[in-house]
């Protein structure tokens, strides 16, 4: 999990900057990595403030669409969203915003680990109402990474902030999975990927995904 002096990150292999200074085209480049088919939403992107904003926008739009369809059909069946996640991770603050979006919706979001989900992506996936993993998918859980520069006092404050955020992340894993404190401490300092069977055993996922 990575951070710089402005944002804190949880990513598989890369450090990112979170400043939005790069020139962008008019169309949101993240839209092509996030799309909807029926009640399935596919997210294949690094987790950034922009991709998180786009994903939350799509989730809210899909919620409205599904509720309208349910009312129109006079259906007593609770509509559900299936979120397929493929990501190397990214900004942990952005991951938190997606979790809060889940909680604000009136219909459940089921998460599907598709191919690979790492770091901040796992924080999202374990918050699904039902949590699935594809047979050949892998998950990476590891600790925060950070880098900063400046005055000693600023560096000290950044370190304290990172400790606070890491404690927050640790508690999420302990609350949402079957991972023990001892084992969490072991895997956070490593970069060892977990397969589908291990994820189910550890409570990171509930079951193998079968196409809905």
Question: Model-predicted segments: where are they?
Answer:
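Terminal-region recognition feature
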Residues: 1-212
């Amino acid at each position: 999990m990575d951070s710089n002096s402005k944002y804190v990150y949880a990513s598989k292999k890369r450090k990112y900057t979170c400043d939005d200074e790069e020139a962008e085209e008019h169309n949101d480049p993240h839209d092509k990595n996030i799309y909807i088919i029926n009640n399935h939403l596919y997210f294949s992107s690094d987790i950034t403030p922009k991709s998180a904003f786009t994903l939350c926008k799509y989730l809210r739009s899909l919620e409205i669409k599904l509720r309208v369809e349910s009312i129109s059909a006079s259906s007593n069946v609770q509509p559900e969203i299936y979120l397929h996640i493929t990501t190397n991770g990214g900004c942990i603050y952005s991951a938190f915003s997606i979790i809060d979006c889940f909680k604000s919706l009136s219909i459940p979001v089921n998460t599907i680990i598709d191919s690979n989900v790492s770091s901040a992506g796992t924080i999202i996936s374990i918050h699904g109402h039902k949590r699935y993993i594809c047979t050949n998918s892998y998950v990476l859980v590891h600790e925060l990474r950070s880098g900063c520069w400046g005055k000693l006092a600023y560096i000290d404050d950044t370190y304290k902030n990172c400790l606070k955020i890491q404690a927050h992340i640790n508690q999420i894993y302990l609350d949402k999975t079957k991972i023990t404190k001892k084992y969490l401490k072991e895997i956070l300092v490593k970069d060892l990927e977990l397969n589908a069977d291990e994820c189910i055993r550890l409570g990171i996922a509930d079951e193998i995904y079968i196409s809905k």
